[in-house]
UniProtKB/Swiss-Prot annotation:
Keywords noted in UniProt: Pathogenesis-related protein, Plant defense, Signal
Protein name (record): Pathogenesis-related protein 1C
Domain of life where this protein originates: Eukaryota
Signal peptide residues on this chain, from the entry's feature table: 1-20
Pfam families cross-referenced by the UniProt entry: Thaumatin (PF00314)
Family: Belongs to the thaumatin family.
Source organism per UniProt: Hordeum vulgare (Barley)
Length: 173
């Protein structure tokens, strides 16, 4: 069997074990927020009480979603009081602290996803983060304890979820 055929078969097996995930993002805050995500999701405006979804492909590693606050944009450029990412509406780099982070890897364990909340970069908004078949994580203030959220790099706060699931992130739950 040729090398390219073996490579194709390996990729097909890996792809069969991991699926994309939908992240539903809800704004329960009393004001508009601007969710951002890397390496997928970019950034967008989300009014109070609104929900939006982003699709995250299988194989996404070290993904992050956070809410920016106090933003002003004109033509895709501007600034935010918290979580700003270089003055751009659509982020391609991490947000400036403070920012409460939803972190994830989709299909990182072949048939498992991994997810957590982190306040290592500071806390700007309360957050709930859940997998449709896993643990519901809650971080309501800057001192949310492990295993609910990472406060320090050596904390144990990563949770596993079987693949083929969707996620819910709620800001200001």
């Amino acid at each position: 069997m040729s090398t390219s055929a073996v490579l194709f078969l390996l990729l097909a097996v890996f792809a069969a074990g991991a699926s994309a995930a939908t992240f539903n993002i809800k704004n329960n805050c009393g004001s508009t927020i601007w969710p951002a995500g890397i390496p997928v999701g970019g950034g967008f405006e989300l009014g109070s009480g609104q929900t939006s979804s982003i699709n995250v492909p299988a194989g996404t590693q070290a993904g992050r979603i956070w809410a920016r606050t106090g933003c002003s944009f004109n033509g895709g450029s501007g600034s935010c009081q918290t979580g700003d990412c270089g003055g751009q509406l659509s982020c391609s780099l991490s947000g400036r602290p403070p920012a409460t982070l939803a972190e994830f890897t989709i299909g990182g364990g072949s048939t498992q996803d991994f997810y957590d909340i982190s306040v290592i970069d500071g806390f700007n908004l309360a957050m709930d983060f859940s997998c449709s078949t896993g643990d519901a994580l809650q971080c309501r203030d800057p001192s949310c304890p492990p295993p609910q959220a990472y406060q320090h790099p050596n904390d144990v706060a990563t949770h596993a979820c079987s693949g083929n699931n969707n996620y819910q992130i709620t800001f200001c739950p």
